[in-house]
């Protein structure tokens, strides 16, 4: 068989069309930030050239977070919205307090922002001390804020980036779900879970404030001819505390809508959930998801690659399954080799259906010999059984 390009190899694996070998495409952003100070695509391509792997890139042609986060540029929000923002330093953090005035009402929030590279790690998450939304009475103001933000940041050109990457990478349009860093960052998840039983209509309306612009952005990128839509949907994860029933009732219909929209334009759909997947993976197959990441193994996750393959059959490609902490960071080249061999044996089929990937980003603490061992093992064991 003629050697495939990275883009061809990834597409063949996702479509079960017989790649020349198992694609290798780990998440690298933490390692890249620590060792090079950037996670930009061109830096990723340099790693790919050195270590011979297959870049699976996501590109945001518009805002993936559909409302202004603290310390944003508010200048384009328009005359109807005014933001007052104060900051103060406290230890290794910055405390940002905001008052956002809209024609429909006033919203307030307070966020603790840790310093990147400090005691909380290379790229720490913000800690929200006061959420923007207090209850249903704030929905009109939130809706105006989201509409103003997305209008000020329309979907731009993704086609040029895809063409620039060419055969060197498979590029997906990057989106975040209506909940992930969107509704889940303006209203606490714990309160939302309780509200599902006490005032479901409020939760549905809150999610749809973000789902509508998400769908509009998805349509806009699909009209540019993207080959794949990538959606991070980890706030919905079983690991966040949701039940399978609530997932089916609340989130699955909205994910299905984005899947079906992508498919109408001929684009593949890639769903990202780095938590527990045993209960939701059958639902993803049910609605036609083409590729699922990251299949985090036990004990953090709750499904093995062998179990995931049984669920996915030959209709859904799997990406991930290698533990970045216990296997890659804290392991040895020999144990990494064994884990990669086992993963490919469990998840790959003669037609493809598996991308050798990681449970999340390879960590900044990973020894160089372990980093290199992962890619060498992928090449060593990547010839598909039966081919």
Placement of each model-derived feature along the sequence:
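A generic structural motif
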Residues: 57-62, 126-130, 386-387
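Generic hydrophobic, aliphatic-rich segments that mediate packing or membrane embedding
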Residues: 44, 92-96, 154-157
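A contiguous, low-structure linker/loop signature
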Residues: 73-145, 168
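Surface-exposed flexible segments
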Residues: 38-45, 108-119, 369
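Segments that shape or occlude catalytic/ligand-binding pockets
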Residues: 37-79
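Active-site loop segments of alpha/beta catalytic cores
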Residues: 1-39, 101, 133-387
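Intrinsically disordered, low-complexity segments enriched in proline/serine/threonine
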Residues: 8, 25-28, 57, 65, ...
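Short, flexible beta-strand-to-coil junctions
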Residues: 28-29, 60-62, 99-104
């Amino acid at each position: 068989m003629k050697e495939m390009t990275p883009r061809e190899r990834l597409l063949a694996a996702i479509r079960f069309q017989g790649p020349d070998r198992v694609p290798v495409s780990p998440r690298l952003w933490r390692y890249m930030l620590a060792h090079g100070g950037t996670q930009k695509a061109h830096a990723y391509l340099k790693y790919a050239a050195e270590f011979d792997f297959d870049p699976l890139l996501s590109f945001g042609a518009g805002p993936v977070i559909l409302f202004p986060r603290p310390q944003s540029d508010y200048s384009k929000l328009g005359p109807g919205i005014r933001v007052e923002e104060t900051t103060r330093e406290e230890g290794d953090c910055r405390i940002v307090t905001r008052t956002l005035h809209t024609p429909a009402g006033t919203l307030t929030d307070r966020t603790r922002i840790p310093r990147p590279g400090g005691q909380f790690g290379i790229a720490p998450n913000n800690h929200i001390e006061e959420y923007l939304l207090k209850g249903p009475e704030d929905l009109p103001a939130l809706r105006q804020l989201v509409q103003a933000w997305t209008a000020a940041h329309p979907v731009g050109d993704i086609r040029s980036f895809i063409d620039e990457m060419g055969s060197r990478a498979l590029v997906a349009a990057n989106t975040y779900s209506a909940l992930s860093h969107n509704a889940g960052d303006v209203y606490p998840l714990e309160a939302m879970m309780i509200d599902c039983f006490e005032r479901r209509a409020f939760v549905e309306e809150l999610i749809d404030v973000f789902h509508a612009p998400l769908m509009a952005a998805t349509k806009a990128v699909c009209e540019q001819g993207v080959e794949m839509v990538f959606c991070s949907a980890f706030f919905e994860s079983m690991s966040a505390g949701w039940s399978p029933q609530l997932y089916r009732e609340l989130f699955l219909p909205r994910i299905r809508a984005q899947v079906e929209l992508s498919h109408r334009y001929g684009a593949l759909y890639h769903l990202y959930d780095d938590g527990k997947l045993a209960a939701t993976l059958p639902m993803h197959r049910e609605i036609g998801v083409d590729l699922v990441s990251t299949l985090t193994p036990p004990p953090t996750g709750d499904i093995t690659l062998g179990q995931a393959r049984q669920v996915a059959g030959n209709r859904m490609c799997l990406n991930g399954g290698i533990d970045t902490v216990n296997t890659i960071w804290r392991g040895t080249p020999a144990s990494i080799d064994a884990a990669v061999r086992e993963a490919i044996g469990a998840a790959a089929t003669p037609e493809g259906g598996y991308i050798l990937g990681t449970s999340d980003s390879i960590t900044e603490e990973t020894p160089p010999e372990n980093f290199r061992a992962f890619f060498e093992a992928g090449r060593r064991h990547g010839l598909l059984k039966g081919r």
